[in-house]
Amino acid sequence: MKTMKKLWILMAALTATLLLCVISASACTMVYVGSDLTADGSSFMARSEDYSNGYNKIAHVNQHGKYAAGSVYEGCYGFIHTFTHDSYAYTATSDDNTSGVCPDCGQTHPHTPMEEVGSNEKGVSVSAMVTLSPNGTVVNADPMEDLGICESDMATILLSEASSAKEGVELLLNIFDTVGAGEPSGVLIGDQNEIWYVENFTGHTYTAIKLS
C-alpha cells in the first residue's frame, strides 16, 4: 500500500513538473495522407499551428465578392495583389485583429492577418504554410523580395482567386516569378481531384509536386 502511495505521489509530481514546463515553439506542422493509405481512396491534408498562445484565432466566412474585380489588396508586409475577378466565398481561420491593429505586423490598414488555412466555394483548400530555413548561399543567389508574398497573404489570395487546385498552384508560381516571395514556405493546395505541394527556399526559385 505504501509503495502504491509513493508511486502515485511520484506520478503526480512528474505530471505537475510537465505542466509547469513551458515549451516554446515557432513552427507549423502539415499532414498529407495519400489515397493509397485510406479505406475509400480519399486524400487528406491538414495542419496545426505551433506558436505562442498570444495569437487568438478566429474562424470566419468571407462572402462572395468581398474583394471586387480590380480592387487592390495590401497584405501585412507590403505585398500587393489586384484581384482578377470578384472573390470566391471561402471559410478560413485567421489571427484576431478585431481591435483594429494586426497582431502580426502592427498595421491598421484593412487586411486579414495570417489567414493561413481555409476552403472556398469551388472546393479548393489551402494550408499555408510550414516554416522552412534555407542556407545563406542560395538566398544570396536568389534573395527574398521585401514586397514579396508571405505566409500572411497566401491563403487569402489563393482562396479568393482559384477555382481549382492546379489554378491555385499556377497563380502562386506566377507570383513567385513576377513579384517574388518574401520568405521561404511549404504550401499544400488541394481540391476533390488532386493535392499539390509547393515549396520555395528563395525569392523566385520553387518546386511544385502533384501528390495525388
Predicted regions and their residues:
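Short, charged, surface-exposed loops that flank catalytic or proteolytic processing sites
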Residues: 161-167
